Amino acid sequence: LAKINLGLDVLGRRENGYHDVRMVMQTIYLYDEVKLTKKKEPGIELTTNLGFLPTGDTNIAYKAAKLLIEEFGISEGVKIVLNKHIPVAAGLAGGSSDAAAVLFGMNRMFGLHLQQKDLMERGVKLGADVPYCIMRGTVLAEGIGEELSVLPAMPKCTVLIAKPPVSVSTKVVYEALDSEEIIEHPDIDALIEGLRQKDLHRISENMGNVLEDVTIPMHPVIEELKQVMRENGAIGAMMSGSGPTVFGLFENRAAAREAQRKIRESGLTKQVYVTNVHN
């Protein structure tokens, strides 16, 4: 399952280059399909429906399988069939959710009896978003993104996702961000209070992402997508993660469908999806 960031604040940069963050993350019902099958012969075989994706040990789903095979001395091999629906390199944690699915599936398939916290401890070795993709739901992430706390569940609403045809490097965006020059930090506490009150309007008013100040000047189409969503009934619209994906929150599914149609007609992007929050 994909994730969006309802709030993303950067508090500072550590000496090792990692950034201290405070983020509110939410799972949405947009998913990849991951099928695992045991093989008698050892080794990992990964296939995917997208020809440009790596299928070897640079693929995070492959790395997840390799991690468990090596740690537990699994003699059999595994075949992974990855059917991608979540846009790639979009700020939606698609790769991280695939890795989480492989950890879940292999835990069950090989009877490893790992609990959720055990899977999360292994997930963080693969990527900062993997533990969250194991946990799912409405979650506060702190530290470098590895300290997770469950929040009151996001109220039901329709989510419109639009991925423009541009690529964004998370590394480049964070490197360009000088935390001392962040003029306005999002009010994460007010956002959390909106979640407690199950008030979609208060949540939307307090959404914020400091990385927009870096990514939008690189790709103005992000601001254009936000504008189209707001003009067509979105209560709030924001870039997710380091971008370039934009999401809008709607109370009315019909309005979200109309905004989807307008975005496609505008030529801004063809990758537009109507979905829901998933708790």
Predicted regions located by residue number:
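Short, basic/glycine-rich phosphate-binding loops at helix/coil junctions
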Residues: 40-54, 102, 197-207
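A generic structural signal for well-ordered coil/turn residues at beta-strand boundaries
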Residues: 2, 30, 134-135, 155-158, ...
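Residues embedded in well-ordered beta-strands within globular domains across many folds
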Residues: 35, 79-81, 238, 273-276
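Hydrophobic packing within well-folded, soluble alpha/beta domains
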Residues: 34, 61, 80, 102, ...
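ATP-dependent small-molecule kinase catalytic core of the GHMP/sugar-kinase superfamily
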Residues: 7-23, 109-236, 249-279
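ATP-binding N-lobe of GHMP and related small-molecule kinases
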Residues: 1-90, 108, 112-120, 154, ...
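Glycine/serine-rich anion-binding loops at beta->alpha junctions
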Residues: 81-110, 128, 235-250
